[in-house]
Amino acid sequence: MPRDTQKSKVYKWEKEFFGDIQRSSVWTEDQCVKYINEAYKWWTSNKDANPVKVNFLNDFNRPSSSYFRPASNCIALQKNIHTNPIVCSHELAHYIQHNDVCRGEAWHGPVFMRVMLTLIDKFTEHSLGDMIKSARAAKVKVAGLKRPNSNKAIRKPSNTFYIPKLTEKDLKFNSSEVYTREWYEAPAKIAAA
């Protein structure tokens, strides 16, 4: 596997682009599991896709980060700080890269970024174009629609094959607010005033 040379750049970009939402616990465990599995079905265009195994960790007895473990094919989320759409999409992108797109690429490489940004674009109000432009300005590489060193396309899901069974209620925060760009930009607007 190639060296993960842009890992720190990816984390830095996520923190700058998404702000505090990235380290917020805004969904219940059930919302996280449903989102991950529905988003995975959408990606694969397969309503019968095997469920993605998701575990929840307490930050006092595990490393403080969430992660995907290829050996167990499991996503682990810190339940007190990482139950939100950004971290769920980040870890699901690792799962998709490992299982469906192209094993052997760097964990935070251009292919991973394309998958993650596609998920975030589909399931939040962040624009794919804005995220790619921002990431590339931060020197984070994002793959085009073809796999590196290959003529094969990175599979871009089609909305016509599987419509995710996610309602507005499924995407609400624990505080009953729906995750929207306005919600997440509001603290910055208040601070600037």
Segments from the language model and where they lie:
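Metalloprotease/metallohydrolase-associated module, dominated by Zn2+-dependent proteases
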Residues: 9-65, 70-78, 101-193
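Non-catalytic architectural context of zinc metalloproteases
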Residues: 1-12, 85
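Short, small/polar residue-rich loop motifs at catalytic or cofactor-binding pockets
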Residues: 82
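Active-site recognition of the HExxH zinc-binding catalytic motif
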Residues: 86-99
